[in-house]
Amino acid sequence: VLETEIGPIVFEARGESNPCSLCARMRRGALHDAAKRFGCNKIALGHHYDDAVETFVMNLFLEGRIGCFSPVTYLSRKDLTMIRPLIFAPEREVASAVRKAGYPVVKSKCPVDGSTQREWTKNWLRQMEKEHKGITKRLFGAMKRGHVSDW
C-alpha cells in the first residue's frame, strides 16, 4: 500500500465538491511515479469487465463521448505500459476468486465511496440488466466492435 496525502489535498486543501476526477488523476500520478522509482515499466491494474462497461456508459451519458480505457495502454511520457489482465472477467468472478484464494481486500478510505456517479451507474446497469437481459454483454460487444480507441 502506497501512503500519500491525496485525501487531505482533495478534500481539505482543495475542498472539491466533485472529487473523483482529481483524486483519480492524483492516484494515477502517484502510482506511475512509484512504478518508475521501483524500475518498473509495466503496471497491472485490476479493472474488470464491469468496470469497462460502467466507464463506457459514464463516458457516453455524462461526457457525450464514446470511450473507455483500453486493455493495454502505453504512456509515452512516463515510458510505462498499463495492462488490465482482468478486463474480460466479470466482477462477480473476480470477487469469487479473491474469496476462494483468501486474498485480503483493502477497503476504500474515500469519504464519498458508495455515493459516486460510478456507484449510480453500477446500480443503473444492474436494473437495466433485469429489464433487458444481456444489455451488459451487448454494451461490452459494442466497445469491442465499435471505434473505441485501442479496443
Stretches found by the model and what they are:
Residues 1-3, 107:
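A structural preference for short, hydrophobic beta-strand core positions in alpha/beta folds
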Residues 8, 15, 19-93:
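Active-site adenylate/phosphate-handling loop in enzymes that bind or generate adenylated species
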Residues 12, 67-151:
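ATP/NTP-dependent adenylation/nucleotidyl-transfer catalytic domains that generate, transfer
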